């Protein structure tokens, strides 16, 4: 009885070891048009200034990154209050999150 289960298990292990490795998948990086990123930054500063009741000149945007088909801009106010602006894949403003 033990031998009947042993041979199929060994055959399975040998076949698994012979399979070719799957190719490594890499995240796609899309280069953002500079004009679009500047427009997104201006919109982010405008929305943050309204949310924090301050002027756009007192808002700093520090990071811009692509994240799962959308974009995020991180920044802070002159009072060191952090926020994140989110944009869709086309660069349209989605929301501002206070951190």
From Swiss-Prot:
The keyword Glycoprotein does not apply. It is found in: Cell membrane. Pfam families: YsaB (PF13983). It is a lipid-anchor. Its main location: membrane. A lipid is attached at residue 18 (N-palmitoyl cysteine). A lipid is attached at residue 18 (S-diacylglycerol cysteine). Residues 1-17 form the signal peptide. GO terms for cellular component: plasma membrane. The keyword Lipoprotein applies. Keywords: Cell membrane, Lipoprotein, Membrane, Palmitate, Signal. This is Uncharacterized lipoprotein YsaB. It comes from Escherichia coli (strain K12).
């Amino acid at each position: 009885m033990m031998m009947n289960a042993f041979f199929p298990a060994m055959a399975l292990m040998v076949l698994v070891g012979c399979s070719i490795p799957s190719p490594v998948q890499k995240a796609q990086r899309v280069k953002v048009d500079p004009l679009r990123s500047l427009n997104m930054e201006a919109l982010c500063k405008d929305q943050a200034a309204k949310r924090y009741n301050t002027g756009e000149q007192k808002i700093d945007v520090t990071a811009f990154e692509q994240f799962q088909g959308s974009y995020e801009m991180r920044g802070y106010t002159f009072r060191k209050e952090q926020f994140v602006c989110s944009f869709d894949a086309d660069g349209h403003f989605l929301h501002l999150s206070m951190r």
